[in-house]
Amino acid sequence: MPTPRLRQFWTLLILLTGTVASMFAASQWAWQRSLHAESDSVQRQLALYGQTLAQRIDRYRTLPEVLALDAQLQSALQRPLRPAEVEQLNLKLEQANGASQSSTLTLLNSDGLAVAASNWRSATSNVGQDYSFRPYVQQALAQGRGSFYGIGVTTGVPGYFLSQAIRDDHGHTLGLVVIKIALQELEREWLQTPDIVLASDAHGVVFLASQDAWRYRLLEPLDDEERSELTATRQYSDQPLRPLELRVDDRLDNGGRLVRLLSADLPPLPGRALWQTQPLPGTPW
C-alpha cells in the first residue's frame, strides 16, 4: 500500500464569522488590532479543541495493549475453535467493550479475518469479515500496532481504529485486537458552539465537522495515487468527497487567514471569515 503523502500537517480548523464581520465597521487601525487579538484568541481555543480530541482517543489507547496480553485471546489464535469457544470470546469482548464504553472490540487472526467481536449479536457483526486490506491491520501485523480513521466497512459507522498485535511467547505474531472509538459524541459537543470546527486527515479530507454539510470535503485536490489509496482502503466508503472552495483574501502573521466561502452547495457565510489551523500532536492525522 502506498505511503500517504503528507501535504502540510494534520489540522483542526475553525471559522469565525460574526466577530470578524463586525470588525469591518471599525477604523482600519482598530480593525487590524482587533482582528489579530481575535485570531490569537481563536488559536488558544483551537488548542483546547485539539486537547479534547486527543484526550478522547487517549482514554482507550491502553486497552488493546492490555487485551493483547490476555492468555485466552492468545490461545484462541493458535488453533481451530469450536462454536462454543467463539461464543465465549464474543462474550469476553462484549463485556470488555461495555466496561470501556468504546464502539467495538474485534479479535483478528494473522490473515486479517475477524475471529470474534463485541458486536456479535448485531446484524452487522464483524465476526467472519475480512479486514486484511485495512491499514490498521497491516500496520499491526508489520509493526506491532496501528491506527486509522475511516467508515466501518461492515457497520457503515465511522470511527477511529487502534490496533495491537498479539504475539506468542516466542514473539511470533498470532493476530491482533482492534478497538474502534466513535467520535460522534464529540461532534455533537461541537454543535454547541457557533463556530465551524473541522478536523482533516493527511489527504486534506475533512472527517470530523461541527456541521454535517462540511464533513467529507476536500481542502485540496487529490491526485490519482491518493484516490487509488482511498479506494483500496475504503476509508470513506462511497462518500463523494466534494471540494471545499475558499478564496483567501488576507493572511495574518500568526497563520490565520481571512477567507470567503465559494462552495455554492454549503450554507453561505456572512461575508469574510477568520480561518485558523493548528496541528494535532499525538494523533496520526
Which stretches of residues belong to each language-model region?
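Amphipathic coiled-coil signal-relay and dimerization helices
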Residues: 75-76, 112-119, 206-210
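Extracellular/periplasmic juxtamembrane segments that couple receptor/chemosensory ectodomains to their
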Residues: 228-285
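Short, hydrophobic-rich beta-strand element in sensory/regulatory alpha-beta domains
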Residues: 64, 103-107, 197-198
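Extracytoplasmic/periplasmic ligand-binding sensor regions of membrane-associated signaling proteins
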Residues: 117-189
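Core beta-strand residues in small-molecule sensory/regulatory alpha/beta domains
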Residues: 108, 167-168, 200
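Juxtamembrane extracytoplasmic/periplasmic/luminal helical "stalk" adjacent to the first N-terminal
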Residues: 8, 15-79, 145
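Solvent-exposed, extracytoplasmic
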Residues: 87-99, 176-234
